[in-house]
């Protein structure tokens, strides 16, 4: 089994819904982006091309982050996912330096610490962040998704790294990753590339594909097909 994703850049509308869905699903703190994007402009006016390229962990078959991790915190599972044992992470950041995609983040501060602030932004007009937490009976953040904690800490520790897990907790329930389910245009297709009958495998066979940083030789499992062209919409 080799799970991964195909992203159709012709269908992608650049709405950022994938980024928001990921953040909500995985309780990521400010500044931590498991799902992100690259804005790229090429050429000179009037011959200018703009590209919006969604990014995430590529769950590489030959993952550099797994190779360099001194504690085994980064590892591959039987489905081909690149996962992390947060309890084993010592915060050395070797995985971050080794990752050719820049998709691993580091918690320099205590995640979500802004919610511990007991001072209101406007006195006698607003509740403090800490008051909001108390109202919803939470100790970390008011919109916590408890299901994230089924396979990985709901909120990660200070001085540890974190990254996309392809929503492994949702896969265990027979669901697709949150970014895939949230995409309004169906630009993201998740599947098993080792299964020739999967939609993901069929798309890779049908289209000319692109992958990021192939020179790194990590055998990434995120493929991009087509590119946005307004003429193809009509």
Segments from the language model and where they lie:
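Non-ligating segments of multi-cofactor redox enzymes
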Residues: 1-234
């Amino acid at each position: 089994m080799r799970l991964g994703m195909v992203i159709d850049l012709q269908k992608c509308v650049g709405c950022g819904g994938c980024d928001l869905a990921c953040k909500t699903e995985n309780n990521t703190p400010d500044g931590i982006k498991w799902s992100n994007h690259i804005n790229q402009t090429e050429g000179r006016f009037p011959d200018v091309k703009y590209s919006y390229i969604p990014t995430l962990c590529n769950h590489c078959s030959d993952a550099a982050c797994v190779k360099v991790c001194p504690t085994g915190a980064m590892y591959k599972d039987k489905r081909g996912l690149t996962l992390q044992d947060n309890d084993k992470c010592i915060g050395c950041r070797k995985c971050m330096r080794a990752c050719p995609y820049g998709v691993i983040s580091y918690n320099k501060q205590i995640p979500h610490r802004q919610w511990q602030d007991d001072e209101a932004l406007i006195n006698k007009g607003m509740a403090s962040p800490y008051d909001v937490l108390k109202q919803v009976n939470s100790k970390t953040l008011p919109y916590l998704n408890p299901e994230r904690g089924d396979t990985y800490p709901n909120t990660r520790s200070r001085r540890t790294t974190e990254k996309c897990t392809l929503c492994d907790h949702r896969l265990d329930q027979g669901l697709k990753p949150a970014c895939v389910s949230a995409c309004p245009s169906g630009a993201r297709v998740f599947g098993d590339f080792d299964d020739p009958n999967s939609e993901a495998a069929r798309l890779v066979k049908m289209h000319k594909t692109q992958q990021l940083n192939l020179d790194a030789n990590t055998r990434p499992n995120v493929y991009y097909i087509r590119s946005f062209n307004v003429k193809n919409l009509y």
